[in-house]
């Protein structure tokens, strides 16, 4: 699939990043892949070595990774009986492992250019986590960015947390590394075919994030079936493409078109520029590498807006 994606990307850069969910059970305090458990300190170096070996094996097959997260949702591993793969870290232990093990190992094995991301968890956690991990000079050296997930964004709508991360660490990027619809316990219908509210929710979140220093946004799933799986932990959710294998067909969801619309106009290397508006439309503007200006607009209201764009040339 990766090779196929590379052939279809045309001239755009193709960036892969990897995210571990759990070390092998025998390396962990609870001897399980899921539930409340932590990486045992005696295996800190072995786990770092695994990262390097993972990258080398892909490299041997002509697949290069752009980035890594240190751990997917490290807070999940603090939750007793957490249902699927997880491993707990706090900011202190993650800093220690990166400084003493992961960072030096990636550097010595020829992967110093890999973009290492910390946190990879919910937005409200980001300011404190980044502040504490990056308080160490060596951690600052090894870490390139902060990964953020969207799952609490509509419950705790605090985009200024992203501003805080940027203001305190302007040389570290912020990347949204995971998002999907149908993830909440109250989402009784996990897959909703043709639901444009879910497409609008994607665009709303992307515009909000881009206006608060986020540099990219990633969906969790490429494609799922009509149930929102397969998923061994019964964690069913929605996806931009839904496949009906019994009929040999697939559906492009509104979320697919939402992502496609933004991706078509907002290309890699674009720089966000200032924008003011006098109505309730959601908007973000970028100057592209080809010097064109791209403006992404979202109208979530039932009435129409008439829009006039005024731009200025700076010489």
Please provide the spans of the model-predicted regions.
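Substrate-binding cleft and catalytic face of glycoside hydrolase catalytic domains
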Residues: 1-136
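Conserved, mostly hydrophobic/aromatic
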Residues: 16, 54, 68, 146, ...
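Carbohydrate-binding surface patches
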Residues: 264, 275-312
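Aromatic/acidic polysaccharide-binding cleft in carbohydrate-active enzymes
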Residues: 173-258, 274-277
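Substrate-binding cleft/loops of secretory-pathway carbohydrate-active enzymes
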Residues: 121-144, 148, 183-194, 227-230
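Active-site clefts of carbohydrate-active enzymes
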Residues: 27-30, 76, 80, 123-128, ...
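Alpha-helical scaffolding within the catalytic cores
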Residues: 100-101, 124-136, 157-164, 200-206, ...
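Glycoside hydrolase catalytic-domain groove-lining segments
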Residues: 100, 107-117, 141-188, 205
């Amino acid at each position: 699939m990766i090779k196929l994606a590379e052939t279809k990307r045309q001239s755009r850069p193709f960036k892969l990043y990897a995210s571990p969910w759990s070390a092998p059970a025998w390396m962990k305090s609870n001897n399980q892949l899921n539930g409340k458990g932590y990486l045992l300190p005696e295996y800190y170096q072995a786990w770092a070595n695994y990262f390097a070996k993972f990258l080398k094996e892909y490299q041997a097959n002509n697949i290069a990774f752009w980035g890594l997260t240190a751990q997917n949702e490290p807070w999940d591993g603090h939750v007793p009986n957490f249902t699927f793969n997880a491993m707990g870290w706090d900011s202190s232990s993650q800093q220690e492992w990166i400084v003493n093990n992961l960072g030096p190992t990636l550097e010595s094995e020829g992967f110093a250019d890999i973009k290492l991301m910390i946190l990879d968890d919910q937005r409200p956690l980001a300011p404190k986590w980044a502040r504490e991990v990056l308080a160490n000079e060596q951690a600052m050296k090894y870490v390139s960015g902060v990964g953020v997930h969207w799952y609490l964004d509509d419950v705790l709508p605090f985009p200024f947390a992203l501003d805080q991360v940027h203001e305190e660490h302007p040389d570290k990027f912020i990347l949204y590394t995971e998002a999907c619809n149908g993830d909440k316990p109250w989402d009784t219908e996990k897959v909703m075919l043709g639901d444009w509210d879910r497409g609008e929710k994607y665009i709303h979140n992307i515009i909000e994030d881009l206006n608060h220093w986020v540099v990219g946004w990633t969906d969790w799933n490429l494609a799922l079936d009509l149930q929102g799986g397969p998923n061994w932990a019964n964690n069913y959710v929605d996806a931009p493409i839904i496949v009906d294998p019994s009929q040999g067909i697939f559906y492009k969801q509104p979320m697919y078109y939402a992502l496609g619309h933004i991706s078509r106009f907002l290309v890699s290397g674009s720089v966000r520029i200032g924008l003011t508006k006098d109505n309730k439309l959601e908007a973000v503007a970028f100057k592209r590498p080809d010097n064109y200006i791209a403006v992404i607009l979202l109208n979530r209201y039932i009435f129409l807006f008439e829009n006039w764009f005024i731009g200025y040339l700076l010489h």
